Amino acid sequence: MNQILEKPENKKWDTKMPGKLTVSIGEYSDKGRKEINQDFHGSYYPEEPLLSSKGIALAIADGINNSYISQIASETSVAGFLDDYYDTSKSSAVKRSAEQVLIATNSWLHAQSQKTHGHPDNDKDYVCTFSSLILKSTTAHILHIGDTRIYRFRAGKLEQLTTDHCLRVSDEISYLNRGLGIYSILDIDYQTTPMKLDDVFFMTTDGVYEHVSNDFIIDTIEEHIDDLDLAAELLVEQAYQVGSSDSLTAQLVKIDELP
């Protein structure tokens, strides 16, 4: 359910073209101990001229646990973003294009949830977290709502780049206070960061990062840097083995060459 775009079997693009951004991507997702996978993820690696004008996009979303239809929100958010972002004007800035798409998605999700309010089924909210990484030229653009996370692994160090939008009541209980579909007005975190050769960006959901240590993440990336699909699978497997009860998703993207 999570593979929304056709890609080569190993999802690794390694054709070296001088002067062009070149990356390797690895992805893995599993429903874990859930009945269904409430996570959704995807990526799109376009050819020219879109590669230069719009960049490479990855997105990840996690539907809220207390809604049995939130997987629709996560799938709609990721699939819609990867489709609609590339339909925006080629001359429009990344921030404007991406926010335009997310605002429209938020409005649709919020409207669907409002239709169900007042009915006996109060567990039918179209709400999810969402994080996107857009790699264009030598800059990484990050858009983020909720508690999915984006990390950067550089020179042996792992750094969390996003902030969790949740209210933590205890070690076991937290509440999402920002997400797609919660409110009619969307508040998006946006930032940019320069990329360096061999940077690895790690995108994941709480089903993974709450159960896997930073040291394990670092060791897994370093050991399997040439097979990021395997690295992503091992991160998910480790989270499951130590007791994660949530859906689990991991995405990795390595910067192989910069313009």
Regions found by a protein language model. Give the residues of each.
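PP2C/PPM-type serine/threonine phosphatase catalytic domain
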Residues: 1-259
